Amino acid sequence: MYAHEEARKYFEARNGFTIDDLTLMSVGLTFEFMLQPWLVAPKHDILSSRKEALAKVLGAVSLPIPAARKIALALRNEMIAATKGNLLTAHRPSILRQHPVIQKADGAYIAPIPELLIQRATSGLYYDFIGVDAQGIRQQAARRFELYVQELIPAYLPGLQCLDEQEIGTKKRKFLSPDVLVLNDDTITVVIECKATKNTFSAQFAADLAVGAIRGINELAKGVFQVWRFYAAVRQGIYTEYPVADTLHGMVVTMDDWLRLDTYVRAEVVKEAHRVADKYSEIEPADRRPVVFTSAHQLAETLALTDEQGWYTALTNAATEKYQGYDLSSILEELGVPAERKAFPFNMEEVMPWQKELPK
């Protein structure tokens, strides 16, 4: 999402080091903390030979203990207010997502969950682009997210083809199809709406969703509405560019996984989608089919583990009440669908040019 020149320049100007510095140091630090809990002097050449970059990255991803306590308390108070004291949700906020390393007064560092360093350097890059002056970069990231999904599916399943959104409708009312149209043998089998917007923690876990999570719910509801609108256009014969399968699947793919296991929030999203759809008489009850929600991570994980038949099996079952909130890959596992991990289909050096420097 952010591996392009404008984002790279913004990141370096803001932080004093590059995105490549962050990803390389995060990988090296992850290995270090897995081998030893406390870090004083790095043992790995990747880190010890880049002391200046290491110091800058540690300064950005770490917090001293007093500051960590203060921010953690503020997060907890925010959560208590948002959930009205009902802290039952599994995915709670943590300072370790943005600052996965804690620093002692004597200068030693510890990463309580080393894997979060990798998360901070990948999906966690979002934290570096939340400023008002980065709005254009975020908009570009949203578009790049759509292109990523379009490239990801045929990269893992080469028998499929993905098309960009298309303008459809009548002369009086034109609108866009969902962001991604998936074709199998020139027939549309899946339509996908992509949502790159991230929610705040309080929005994700708020007890009063109408207040706390309205932004996130509205965004996802628009995605569901777009899918339903496409179903209606197909039924009415307005969309005729490609044949459409009778078993057409609708999906909303997010950058976050905060809908995972959360059937209550999911229900609120669908409820809001119905409210929006009620304004359009052409969208009939038959068009309002179940829509599958999944994160980009889960989409990639599922595609890496299965073939076309397995993917369609996962989508069919994910739309049922029984499997609402399940990871797509977990559905395949529960159904006993054979899984065999495929090689990563893209060139990693495009986003991690330092990869060749890692020890074999």
Question: Which ranges hold each PLM region?
Answer:
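Short, contiguous acidic/charged loop-to-helix segments that flank catalytic cores in large enzymes
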Residues: 136-141, 170-171, 210-222, 288
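Catalytic cores of nucleic-acid endonucleases
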Residues: 196-251
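Flexible loop/turn segments at secondary-structure boundaries
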Residues: 169-176, 198-201, 257-261
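Short conserved micro-motifs at the rims of enzyme active sites and ligand-binding pockets
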Residues: 123, 193, 203-205, 261-265
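Interfaces and regulatory segments of ATP-dependent nucleotide/adenylate/phosphodiester-chemistry enzymes
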Residues: 1-156, 266-360
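C-terminal catalytic or substrate-handling cores of phosphate/nucleotide-
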Residues: 230, 238-275
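Conserved catalytic cores of phosphodiester-cleaving nucleases, focusing on short active-site segments
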Residues: 153, 180-182, 188-196
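A short acidic/basic microdomain associated with nuclease active sites
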Residues: 155-176, 180
